[in-house]
Every structure is written in structure tokens, then in C-alpha cells.
Design a protein with these regions (language model features):
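Alpha-helical subdomain
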Residues: 108-110
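Left-handed beta-helix
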Residues: 1, 6-7, 12-21, 26-27, ...
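Conserved beta-strand-loop-alpha-helix hinge in the C-terminal portion
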Residues: 85-106
Length: 110
């Protein structure tokens, strides 16, 4: 397996990341240090476009993170996250909607 990673991925602070080889990561995502996208059965998470993931987040297998979602620091994501939601905690729960374009490192297509 090889993880599929879209363009514009930003990795903040150069900290360690663990990304399972079956993960799918969309365009213009922002990962903080100590992020884990794990799976025991090679069925890792699907992370859609423009997602922000805070530091020390763990995303378990068979989870889909919707476009524009934000995952708070230290969260453990065990269930799907709807698009444009902010989730925090262990297990992560939605606390509010977000409707802004937080990720500004978009590549220009020529």
C-alpha cells in the first residue's frame, strides 16, 4: 500500500507523523506535529480537502473526515466527521460549525 496524498499538504513544525499506507489525504490539508492516521487492517482514514488537524491527534481506521473540518489538539477521532465541523476531545465530538476557508496554501493550477 502507498498512501494517496493530494497537493498542498502543509506539515507544521516538522514534527513526527504516522500515516498508514492505506490513508487517502485530500488537497490543501494542514497537519500539525505528532499526528497519527492509523489502521490495523489497512483501511485507514479518508481525509477530504482543506482539513486542519491539530497537534497530537489520532485518527482511527474506517473514518472519513469531511471537507473543511477542523480537529482540535489531542483529539481521538473514532467516527466520521461531517464537512465544516470542529471536533475535539476523546472521543472527538462536534462542537460547532466552521464556514471559513482556513487553509490558504492553495496551489494555482495553470
Amino acid at each position: 500500500y502507498k498512501a494517496k496524498i493530494g497537493y498542498g499538504l502543509y506539515i507544521g513544525h516538522g514534527g513526527p507523523l504516522i500515516i498508514n499506507g492505506s490513508a487517502i489525504i485530500g488537497n490543501n490539508c494542514n497537519f500539525s506535529q505528532f499526528t497519527t492516521i492509523g489502521s490495523l487492517s489497512n483501511n485507514a482514514a479518508i481525509i477530504e480537502d482543506n482539513v486542519y488537524i491539530g497537534p497530537q491527534v489520532c485518527i482511527l481506521e474506517n473514518v472519513r473526515i469531511g471537507t473543511g473540518a477542523m480537529i482540535g489538539a489531542g483529539s481521538i477521532v473514532t467516527k466520521n466527521v461531517e464537512k465544516n465541523k470542529v471536533v475535539v476531545g476523546n472521543p472527538a465530538k462536534a462542537i460547532k460549525d466552521v464556514n471559513i476557508d482556513v487553509i490558504n496554501n492553495k496551489w494555482i493550477k495553470y
